[in-house]
Amino acid sequence: MAEGGFDPCECVCSHEHAMRRLINLLRQSQSYCTDTECLQELPGPSGDNGISVTMILVAWMVIALILFLLRPPNLRGSSLPGKPTSPHNGQDPPAPPVD
């Protein structure tokens, strides 16, 4: 204990505060018990209705598929039979004039 009867540790961690934390910990970890059985979780609807990693991955795959199907024609690999594949119809471009 420090001089004058003042204990700085008492301000941070008092006996009452430690007992409250212990009681809260015990209350939270207790099982729900009846006369015939003890359950770890309370009966009723489950609270696990959050978004899972699988749902996020499926959503990204759907977005990727939609973007793939809606891409512009110039990014598609196939060309129409009557259209040339390049501006020079498969031939080398003409040489630049020599000065």
UniProtKB/Swiss-Prot annotation:
TM spans (from-to): 50-70
Main location: endoplasmic reticulum
Region (Disordered): 78-99
Keywords associated with the record: Endoplasmic reticulum, Membrane, Transmembrane, Transmembrane helix
Residue ranges that the UniProt entry lists as topological domain Lumenal: 1-49
Topology in the lipid bilayer: Single-pass membrane protein
Localization per Swiss-Prot or TrEMBL: Endoplasmic reticulum membrane
Cytoplasmic side: 71-99
GO biological process, alphabetically ordered: blastocyst hatching
Pfam family of the protein (one): DUF2615
Domain of life per record: Eukaryota
A cellular-component GO term for this protein: endoplasmic reticulum membrane
The protein's name: Small integral membrane protein 14
Record lineage: Eukaryota, Metazoa, Chordata, Craniata, Vertebrata
